[in-house]
């Protein structure tokens, strides 16, 4: 019997730390799991090479975010392509609300049968309550 096929996605340092912990636990519980992903140094530290370079997403501030919008859209497309090509059973999207929403939308369009899980959702109560509807 083969283990689950899991694709992890983290686009910022805090998410990358969480992904590392999830990968370590998943390997402990299911040693035959196939795990691929997109992330940074923490993901690499557990032996998973990032499918795409996410360094352009390391942005701070409103104006820097506006300048990087084209990169966000391009990387969301590249991430979705990598996910669909890997054909996982489940994708775990960690943190980075805006980027992960774009990735999730693209994956749903290209491969609607792939299950998507959001780990560390946005603080709906602290930001925009309308996000709760989008998450559901």
State what each model feature region is.
Residues 4-136:
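Active-site and donor-binding regions of nucleotide-sugar-utilizing enzymes
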């Amino acid at each position: 019997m083969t283990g689950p096929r899991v694709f992890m996605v983290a686009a910022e340092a805090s998410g990358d730390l969480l992904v590392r912990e999830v990968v370590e636990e998943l390997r402990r519980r299911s040693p035959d799991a196939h795990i691929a992903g997109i992330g940074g140094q923490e993901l690499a530290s557990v032996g998973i090479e990032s499918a795409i370079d996410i360094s352009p997403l390391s942005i701070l501030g409103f104006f820097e975010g506006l300048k990087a919008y084209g990169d966000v859209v391009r990387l969301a497309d590249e991430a979705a392509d990598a996910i669909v090509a890997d054909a996982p059973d489940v994708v775990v999207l960690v943190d980075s609300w805006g980027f992960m929403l774009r990735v999730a939308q693209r994956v749903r369009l290209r491969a609607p049968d792939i299950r998507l899980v959001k780990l560390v959702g946005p603080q709906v109560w602290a930001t925009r309550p309308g996000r709760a509807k989008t998450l559901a």
